[in-house]
Amino acid sequence: MIDRLAMIGVNVKTASREHVARLEKEWEKHLDTIGYASRGTVIIATCNRFEVYLDSPSRLVEDLASSIASPGGEGLVRLQGIDAARHLFRVASGLESQIIGDHEVLGQVRRAWLKSREKGFTTPLLDEVFHRALKTGARVRSESAISSGGVGYSSAAVSLAASLLGGGLDGARVGIVGAGMAAVGIARALCTRWRPRVVAVFNRTPERGWEVAGKCRGVESLVLPLDELAKLINELDALFVAIAGSTNILERGRVERGVSPRVIVDISNPPVTPKVAGRVFHMPEVEEEAKRMMEERLRWIPAAEAIIEEELEALLDALSRRRARESSRSVMRALSILAEREYERTLAGLRNGVDPREAVELALNSYTKKVGGALRRLLEEASDRGQLSLEDIEAILVSEFARIAENSGFKNGSTG
């Protein structure tokens, strides 16, 4: 059953970002075009990848899916069966992301699957595969540290300060200078991982400062003009700086003489604080921390891959059980038709005066011989071939029962 699964796609490693972005922009159009022509389709479309997952692709569907290749047909990735499933599980687990352990991709996989289900484009095979992929992605994140923390400079700045303070940032008095994306990232990383006592945001325009403070819900927050920093700096345990400009906002002597803040991390480019050993840290130290955090994630790749292989085995078991149930239903339908024919023959015999007991015995004997004949043919095939797949067994039994049922006529009231 897994052999029916296929993936055709491109990503930023095999095609240009511009090409992937164009495909992402029109992904719903591609989903409708391929979805209505195929047995089953799910398309994962992000800024990094455009991948079409198919159940039993036909030549037409393959041609449609191949249209996503870059000009010249380059960059197209094709995977089949268990390889396609393994790739999807790696995507959901964040192992194929630009940033290993990426959090967002799991939600992107979920939304892609749900969109196809909403349009009626999924099949039991695709539903099982995507359900297992989401479970795998969740397991990898909960049973490993591959997604712990962030790996951007904002997250690295927070991680560096927490390690330098020794006990982390719970209960700390924290200042953030700036209101741009980097400052927002610092606030998000800070209040996602830690629970500071108070967060004070200093900015030239306090209105924008509330965008930063808003990332620390449930924490006492202050937004103050930048010129208030000099008055309050000694009350802070840690200070983060992320602003544009080249003018120092703190005097070296003040930093060297002061007891607080114990740690200042400045990710501004260029830095706007004086470098003071052991107290003030700039981008080189933050870059080292980001590198360390990424290396920590990379250490968890073998554990993540082991989980993926476990879940692939579970997927194959689930698909095997599903296929067995489908085969069982198919064989039972064929048996029901055969039983119905015997029932009709028995009724005809009774109407023609056959003794009821004799009619039942004849019907049972006839049914047993016919089922036994089908089983005998199955055993002969197994002996000749040496091994039969589930599909072979189903095909032999269903075709044999259908042939017997077709030939089960009756003459002159005979039930034999």
From Swiss-Prot:
Q: Give the molecular function GO annotations.
A: glutamyl-tRNA reductase activity; NADP binding
Identify the enzyme class: oxidoreductase
Record-annotated residues binding NADP(+)? Answer: 178-183
Question: What interactions and quaternary structure are annotated?
Answer: Homodimer.
According to its UniProt entry, the protein's GO biological process terms are:
protoporphyrinogen IX biosynthetic process from glutamate
Q: Where does substrate bind?
A: 46-49, 97, 102-104, 108
Which protein are we looking at? Glutamyl-tRNA reductase
Entry's EC annotation: 1.2.1.70
Q: Which organism is it from?
A: Aeropyrum pernix (strain ATCC 700893 / DSM 11879 / JCM 9820 / NBRC 100138 / K1)
Catalytic activity field: (S)-4-amino-5-oxopentanoate + tRNA(Glu) + NADP(+) = L-glutamyl-tRNA(Glu) + NADPH + H(+)
Where exactly are the transmembrane stretches of this chain? none
UniProt note: domains: Possesses an unusual extended V-shaped dimeric structure with each monomer consisting of three distinct domains arranged along a curved 'spinal' alpha-helix. The N-terminal catalytic domain specifically recognizes the glutamate moiety of the substrate. The second domain is the NADPH-binding domain, and the third C-terminal domain is responsible for dimerization.
What does the record's miscellaneous section state? During catalysis, the active site Cys acts as a nucleophile attacking the alpha-carbonyl group of tRNA-bound glutamate with the formation of a thioester intermediate between enzyme and glutamate, and the concomitant release of tRNA(Glu). The thioester intermediate is finally reduced by direct hydride transfer from NADPH, to form the product GSA.
Question: Keywords in UniProt for this one?
Answer: NADP, Oxidoreductase, Porphyrin biosynthesis
Keyword Translocase on this protein?
A: no
Which residues are annotated as active site?
A: 47 (nucleophile)
Q: Where does the entry annotate site (Important for activity)?
A: 87
- Enumerate the Pfam families for this protein: GlutR_dimer, GlutR_N, Shikimate_DH
The biological pathway it contributes to is: Porphyrin-containing compound metabolism; protoporphyrin-IX biosynthesis; 5-aminolevulinate from L-glutamyl-tRNA(Glu): step 1/2
Fetch the SUPFAM superfamilies from UniProt. Glutamyl tRNA-reductase catalytic, N-terminal domain (SSF69742), Glutamyl tRNA-reductase dimerization domain (SSF69075), NAD(P)-binding Rossmann-fold domains (SSF51735)
Q: Which family does it belong to?
A: Belongs to the glutamyl-tRNA reductase family.
Protein's UniProt keywords contain Ligase: no
Q: Which InterPro entries match?
A: 4pyrrol_synth_GluRdtase, 4pyrrol_synth_GluRdtase_dimer, 4pyrrol_synth_GluRdtase_N, GluRdtase_CS, GluRdtase_dimer_dom_sf, GluRdtase_N_sf, NAD(P)-bd_dom_sf, Shikm_DH/Glu-tRNA_Rdtase
Q: Which PROSITE patterns match?
A: GLUTR
Give the protein's function.
Answer: Catalyzes the NADPH-dependent reduction of glutamyl-tRNA(Glu) to glutamate 1-semialdehyde (GSA).
